[in-house]
């Protein structure tokens, strides 16, 4: 019996030693673009980031309602952004409740998915090509809607009349913007307010189709 038990243990040791890469998996921070756009769950995760950025409750300003930034209500969280806004903390260079950076980050997630997450490289259903096609059509529609949503959020906060009296919109993000491109501030011009609205409506129409 001892010989049998010893043989089993020895065989097990050889089994594990022979498979060095059995548990050789990648941790999250080692996953690159080539992995992201091959694995359907990871690809969809990029798009879902744009969903996660949407406020899901009315008191989304650091647990405060936006009314706390006016005379309608008062907050006792003096370190919050709405308190700073109420106390006159808004300047041309600092908006305590601004969503500029966050919204454009969300748009980058959407555009990255539109450019990479709908190709033949990623399969959302490996057994039925027709189902895979339908899933991609649905995800494409969601992407266009999310792009319209985030442009609308930016337009609400930053669109309006300029010094010359013309109604201006916001810089349109119709593609993935790299860090190098983002550093070229002169490349991003504000179109007219109507042009921004037209862009949003066009994306909504694409989402419907």
Task: Annotate the PLM regions.
Residues 178-188:
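Substrate-binding clefts and substrate-entry loops adjacent to catalytic sites
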């Amino acid at each position: 019996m001892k010989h049998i038990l010893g043989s089993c243990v020895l065989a097990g040791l050889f089994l594990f030693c022979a498979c060095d890469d059995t548990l050789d998996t990648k941790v999250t921070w080692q996953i690159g673009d080539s992995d992201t756009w091959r694995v359907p769950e990871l690809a969809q995760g990029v798009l879902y980031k744009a969903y996660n950025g949407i406020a899901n409750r009315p008191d989304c300003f650091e647990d405060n309602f936006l009314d706390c930034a006016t005379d309608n209500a008062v907050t006792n969280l003096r370190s919050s952004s709405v308190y700073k806004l109420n106390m006159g903390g808004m300047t041309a260079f600092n908006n305590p409740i601004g969503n500029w950076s966050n919204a454009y980050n969300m748009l980058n997630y959407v555009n990255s998915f539109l450019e990479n997450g709908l190709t033949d490289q990623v399969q959302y259903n490996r057994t039925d090509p027709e189902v895979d096609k339908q899933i991609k059509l649905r995800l494409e529609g969601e992407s266009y809607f999310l792009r319209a949503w985030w442009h609308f959020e930016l337009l609400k906060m930053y669109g309006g009349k300029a010094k010359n009296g013309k109604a201006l919109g916001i810089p349109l993000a119709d593609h993935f913007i790299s860090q190098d491109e983002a550093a070229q501030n002169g490349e991003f011009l504000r179109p007219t307010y109507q042009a921004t609205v037209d862009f949003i409506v066009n994306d909504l129409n694409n989402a419907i189709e």
